[in-house]
Amino acid sequence: MYTINKNIIVINKPINWTSNDVVQKVKRIIKAKKVGHAGTLDPNASGILVLGINEGTKLLTKLTLDSKTYVAEIQFGISTNTYDSTGEIISKINKFITLTEIESAIENLYKNEYWQKPPKFSALKINGKKAYELARNNISFEIEPRLVKIFEYNILDFNYEKQILKIIIKVSKGFYVRSFAVDLAARINNLAHLLSLVRTESGQFSINDAIEIEQVYDYWNNINKHSTN
């Protein structure tokens, strides 16, 4: 297991937990004064969440987490208001696409940086309020697009009958895979939303460095016991 500091813990966030849920749970388990996280992970996603404990919170901004790697499943033919499977279905299209079309569209996005607009249902702050809170209350607002980049990708599977793509993708900081799914579909005149998402790498950390929430108590006691010897 890779670690740079005893006050940095890498958690394998369970699905249906918010990043803040994990922070508060860990804080209670180890009775820490302060716990923070680097890189929000959507509730519907699982995988790496890097935590700073007490003095470790000051290290979070210094960590090199400029790239993230995800394994994603994308459902074509259906769009939702959240860009993932938790949202309301907005539209459907009865148009099957091919793997060749998908590969061509990804290549066009892959070559250079491109402007990506984050989902309105996100934790980004708009005038001091979280975007998803505004979206849930049907308040009109706009999110500025940001420059993002795909560093690497590999198509793991494409089920033509179900129109589901499974892909591993390494991307820049601030990249939204939900937006990528929508942008990708738009380039081939289709619709899409994200079915599932697992973050397997965050900067220098990999999923192999992560521990389950149930392991936090023993891990914390063990690492602090050794550090005082």
Swiss-Prot record:
Gene behind the chain: truB
Catalytic site: 42 (nucleophile)
Entry GO MF terms: RNA binding; tRNA pseudouridine(55) synthase activity
Matches recorded under HAMAP family: TruB_bact (MF_01080)
Superkingdom of this protein's organism: Bacteria
PANTHER family assigned to the protein according to its UniProt record, in alphabetical order: PSEUDOURIDYLATE SYNTHASE TRUB1, TRNA-PSEUDOURIDINE SYNTHASE
Keyword Lyase appears in the UniProt entry: no
GO BP of this protein: mRNA pseudouridine synthesis; tRNA pseudouridine synthesis
Family stated for the protein in its record: Belongs to the pseudouridine synthase TruB family. Type 1 subfamily.
Enzymatic class: isomerase
Signal peptide feature range: none
Assigned keywords, A-Z: Isomerase, tRNA processing
Name of this chain's protein: tRNA pseudouridine synthase B
Source lineage: Bacteria, Bacillati, Mycoplasmatota, Mycoplasmoidales, Mycoplasmoidaceae
Function: Responsible for synthesis of pseudouridine from uracil-55 in the psi GC loop of transfer RNAs.
Pfam family, one: TruB_N
Entry's EC annotation: 5.4.99.25
Reaction(s) the record says it catalyses: uridine(55) in tRNA = pseudouridine(55) in tRNA
